[in-house]
């Protein structure tokens, strides 16, 4: 029989000791008497590298320290400690309308399995900044991924009762294993009890009978090993351990903390020094009687909510357990000294050297031997511990409880006779002179805003637009007024009235918007796939399919580099291609270099992205009977010409958009499309949508004041109930803006760990939060801060990752496979035709799989794990490979990097103000509202103000604007609609007392 502590952390986790490495873990395992130790943190690449360097294989699936890494010590075991690969992952996500924060422990049989699982998880989120990574992934999805990579893995929900971060936790947990894991619940065989509960408590919950209830230390430093551990009566091997945990055969019981010593045993509010029993919490309505804030509901209270059995119930076949205290604490409690002091440490080492490891001393060593080595007081302390005769002061709200072995009087009277103490009940913490009648009033909770029925019933203006019979209809739709709904409803009603789907076309501004439109139409009408839906470029490419070959990005860069070299131009290929695009969109001038590039592109038999519009204009006979154009304010001159051509003389044209959101002049957008249309088609019917469903009145008021300086009247009316004030945080620097945002996000999700959890009335998931900025540079500052804080995020980019060789080569390979196109670039990337054929044979059967799955397997096959490839994987949220490849060719900034709501992993979204167009989030941080940055000095002020307006109107409920240095002039224009705050208040100085 041996002791196993399977849940610990390394020095790569937050709030851990610097000595949490293998040599010190091995040393302390010997001192504690633990034979099997989890490595912890297997997801962290630096830790895995250390494990590979300091460990060597032992029994099947287990490792031991290499001799050269071993530290000498006073205490030895008959068998040197073994290590098993383990790690803890924090899952923060939304399920069933509630934010869930669940920690899970995973055991693996090898370093290779750890490497493979870590690789898979790195395509989902950031696993490098913390040994216990935070993923916006459900526990069920994490379990599925784990078993998919390693079927022999053991998956254990961690410290299941902890209030803020566990499967059954009071604030974010579930009521059953099935509720958490769904149809994968049968794969859960063991649950971890946590320090604040013990088997006696857990036996009261009948549904736990079928699980192996394990106990581990969750140690953040080697000296904390073995606070709780498991007794295993089975051979030393991973298969035997797995069997013991999954079947209970060979699982002999646990060594336990006194649950009262755990820091979440009782209820309470630490800031008000208030500890409550579950009954008292109910008496006060769950609110602190001192300050009125929510009380942290402890483990005992939560367990009682799910318990069906009385206290002291012992089911048949229950495993034995023992309550223990760490030996240094026993020494300190017996002598009245500090457990971390020199005297306690000297006695501890002396006892180990003379009597053996700690677990043996506490459980088995004759008390006479203890008395000879350490004195009568320590022997008596151990006697009382073994008998369970201890004094308990329970922990609450993150504050550890205290277990005493002697009364203060006994400690003072060191020479007096020692007597056994009766069990002392937990003292109830009665709030002084407070009762429910005179307690502070509970915080008032607002009634939830009534759900609008805009998803099912149109308002009067929306209905008028959907039913319009005019040959040309122009709809002015401000933000949040149901633009996409109105457009979808109109198309659906046309089909219901007998219009053939093949005669209908809907042009969107982004691939993502086209995807959303298709999904809505599929849910609304039959034969929706027959309706033409796409961006200008994707529709043009479809019309020209078979007539034109679209140049891969690598070919464009190659031709650009050749022209730059030949003409001695002083610019990078990427910048040159930007100039070419501007020229083709009517925003730039031609040059000899640009003309030569276009000639070479034609000679290669290819066209680029911007050629598609011009080529489509040559097909004069192509028209649509019912043409719909979304985001009409953003079309450029050639696209406008194409709209008029596609509508023809007999077709019906329906355009919708918001002139206040015209922000793409740099791409050729003319900005006056609505005015031009009304001049060209004076018979057009103009309809205005004015009821805004997206924002609170506070956000909408700020937005209207921001855009007001551009002139004109706007009649937007908020439908939502009032919400939080718009905040303006003034920071000392750009870096402090990033730090402020990271800390605020951590607060909004209720804290990232048990050291910094928040006390929010309403919690958000990471996926409900966005960070927007004018430039990628500002976003990179914020991103660094988020990643250092361990917050998962989808990073913004200027698209440069698409030019990385491993990315362009990957897209070329799958483009050749999926479309049967030219394979020359892919062959070059793979190193020849033979390598291409091998890869083709392996991946052709996978072409129908989801793009994320394909890219994950391709990354393993090609050993690709670069940041650029990870960005490609982040963007692979499409339903099938052709759609994904088209998006990579056609998509804008937001399409590639912000996959909307389709990702299974929740992450904070980072986007430029341009890239965020069309998105909306419950919470938005708008960063870098500084002079010369928003707006830039050379920019058109009116368009930059529209861009600021777009940023503000991405926020549904909460908007936080940050600034540093000299503020943007736009901030003066919204004065009165924002609540200012100093993100770094100056320290308050006071005279220190001499005493």
Give the ranges of each region predicted by the language model:
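Conserved helicase C-terminal RecA-like lobe
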Residues: 783-785, 804, 811-981
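Helicase P-loop NTPase motor core
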Residues: 474-491, 682-685, 692-791, 818
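Accessory N-terminal region flanking or inserted into the helicase ATPase core
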Residues: 451-467, 471-475, 481, 485-486, ...
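Conserved helicase motor core of SF1/SF2 NTP-dependent helicases
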Residues: 481-484, 622, 626-629, 633-709, ...
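P-loop NTPase Walker
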Residues: 446-547, 648, 701, 953
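C-terminal functional module detector
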Residues: 2, 27, 45, 56, ...
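Extended substrate/RNA-proximal surfaces in nucleic-acid metabolism proteins
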Residues: 13, 20, 48-189, 420
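Conserved P-loop NTPase-based nucleic-acid remodeling module centered on helicase motor cores
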Residues: 503-578, 591-592, 604, 743, ...
């Amino acid at each position: 029989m041996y002791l196993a502590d399977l849940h610990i952390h390394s020095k790569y986790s937050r709030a851990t000791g610097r000595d949490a490495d293998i040599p010190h873990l091995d040393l302390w395992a010997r001192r504690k008497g633990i034979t099997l130790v989890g490595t912890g943190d297997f997801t962290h690449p630096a830790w895995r590298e250390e494990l590979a360097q300091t460990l060597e294989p032992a029994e099947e699936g287990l490792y031991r320290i290499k001799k050269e890494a071993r530290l000498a010590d006073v205490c030895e075991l008959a068998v040197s400690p073994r290590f098993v690969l383990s790690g803890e992952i924090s899952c923060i996500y939304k399920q069933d309308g509630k934010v869930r924060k669940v920690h899970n422990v995973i055991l693996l049989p090898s370093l290779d399995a750890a490497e493979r699982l870590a690789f898979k998880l790195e395509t989902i989120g950031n696993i490098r900044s913390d040994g216990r990574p935070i993923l916006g992934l459900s526990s069920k999805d994490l379990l599925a991924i784990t078993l998919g990579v390693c079927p022999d893995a053991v998956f254990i929900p961690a410290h299941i009762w902890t209030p803020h971060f566990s499967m059954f936790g009071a604030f974010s947990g579930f009521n059953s294993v099935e509720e958490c894991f769904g149809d994968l619940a049968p794969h859960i065989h063991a649950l971890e009890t946590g320090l604040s509960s013990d088997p006696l408590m857990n036996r009261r919950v009948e549904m736990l009978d079928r699980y192996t209830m394990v106990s581990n230390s969750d140690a953040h430093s080697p000296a904390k090993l073995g606070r709780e551990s498991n007794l295993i009566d089975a051979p030393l091997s991973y298969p035997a351990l797995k069997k013991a945990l999954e079947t209970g055969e060979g699982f002999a019981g646990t060594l336990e903390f006194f649950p009262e010593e755990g820091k979440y045993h009782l209820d309470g509010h630490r800031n008000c020094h208030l500890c409550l029993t579950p009954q008292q919490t109910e008496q006060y309505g769950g609110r602190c009687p001192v300050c009125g804030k929510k009380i942290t509901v402890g483990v005992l209270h939560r367990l009682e909510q799910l318990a069906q059995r009385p206290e002291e119930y012992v089911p048949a076949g229950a495993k034995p357990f023992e309550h223990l205290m760490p030996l240094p604490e026993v020494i300190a409690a017996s002598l009245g000294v500090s457990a971390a002091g020199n005297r306690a440490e000297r006695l501890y080492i002396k006892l180990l050297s003379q009597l053996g490891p700690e677990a043996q001393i506490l459980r088995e060593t004759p008390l006479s031997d203890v008395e000879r080595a350490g004195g009568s007081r320590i022997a008596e302390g151990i006697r009382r511990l073994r008998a369970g005769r201890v004094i308990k002061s329970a922990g609450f709200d993150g504050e550890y409880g205290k277990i005493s072995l002697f009364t203060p009087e006994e400690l003072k009277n060191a020479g007096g006779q020692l007597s056994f103490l009766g069990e002392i009940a937990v003292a109830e913490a009665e709030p002084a002179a407070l009762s429910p009648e005179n307690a502070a009033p509970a915080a008032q909770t607002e009634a939830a805003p009534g759900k609008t029925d805009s998803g099912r019933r149109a308002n009067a203006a929306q209905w008028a637009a959907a039913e319009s019979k005019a040959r040309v209809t122009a709809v002015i739709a401000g933000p949040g007024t149901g633009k996409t709904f109105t457009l979808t409803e109109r198309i659906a009603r046309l089909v219901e009235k007998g219009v053939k789907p093949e005669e209908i076309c809907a042009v969107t501004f982004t691939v993502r918007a086209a995807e959303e439109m298709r999904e809505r139409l599929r849910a609304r009408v039959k034969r929706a796939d027959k309706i033409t839906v796409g961006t200008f470029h994707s529709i043009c490419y479809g019309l020209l399919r078979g007539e034109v070959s679209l140049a891969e990005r690598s070919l464009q860069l190659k031709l650009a580099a050749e022209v730059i070299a030949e003409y001695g131009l002083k610019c990078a290929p990427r910048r040159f291609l930007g100039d070419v695009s501007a020229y083709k969109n009517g925003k730039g001038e031609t040059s000899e270099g640009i003309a030569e590039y276009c000639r070479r592109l034609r000679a290669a038999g290819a066209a680029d992205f911007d050629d598609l519009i011009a080529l489509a204009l040559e097909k004069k006979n192509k028209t649509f009977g019912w043409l719909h154009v979304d985001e009409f304010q953003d079309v450029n001159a050639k696209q406008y010409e194409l709209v008029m051509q596609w509508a023809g003389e007999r077709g019906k044209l329906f355009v919708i958009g918001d002139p206040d959101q015209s922000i793409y002049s740099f791409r050729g957008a003319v900005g006056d499309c609505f005015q031009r249309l009304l001049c060209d088609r004076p018979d057009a019917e103009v309809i205005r949508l004015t009821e805004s469903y997206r924002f609170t009145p506070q956000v909408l008021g700020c937005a209207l004041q921001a855009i007001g300086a551009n002139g004109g009247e706007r009649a937007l009316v908020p439908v939502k109930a009032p919400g939080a004030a718009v905040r303006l945080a003034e920071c000392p620097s750009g870096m402090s803006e990033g730090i402020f945002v990271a800390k605020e996000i951590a607060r909004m999700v209720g804290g990232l760990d048990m050291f910094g959890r928040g006390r929010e009335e309403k919690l958000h998931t990471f996926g409900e939060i966005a960070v927007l900025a004018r430039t990628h540079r500002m976003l990179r500052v914020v991103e660094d801060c988020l990643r250092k804080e361990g917050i998962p995020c989808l990073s913004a980019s200027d698209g440069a990752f698409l030019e990385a060789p491993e990315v362009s080569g990957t897209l070329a390979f799958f483009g050749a496979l999926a479309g049967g196109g030219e394979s020359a670039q892919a062959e070059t990337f793979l190193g020849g035709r033979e390598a291409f054929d091998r890869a083709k044979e392996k991946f052709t059967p996978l072409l129908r799989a989801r793009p994320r799955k394909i890219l994950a397997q391709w990354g393993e096959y090609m050993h690709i794990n670069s940041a650029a490839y990870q960005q490609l994987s982040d963007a692979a949220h499409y339903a099938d490979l052709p759609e994904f490849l088209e998006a990579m060719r056609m998509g804008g900034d937001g399409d590639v990097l912000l996959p909307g709501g389709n990702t299974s992993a929740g992450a904070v979204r980072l986007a430029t103000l341009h890239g965020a167009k069309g998105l909306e989030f419950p919470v938005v941080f708008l960063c870098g509202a500084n002079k010369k940055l928003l707006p830039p000095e050379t920019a058109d002020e009116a368009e930059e103000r529209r861009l600021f307006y777009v940023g503000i109107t991405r926020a549904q409920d909460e908007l936080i604007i940050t600034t540093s240095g000299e503020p943007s002039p736009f901030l003066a224009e919204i004065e009165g609609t924002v609540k200012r705050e100093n993100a770094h208040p100056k320290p308050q100085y006071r005279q220190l007392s001499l005493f």
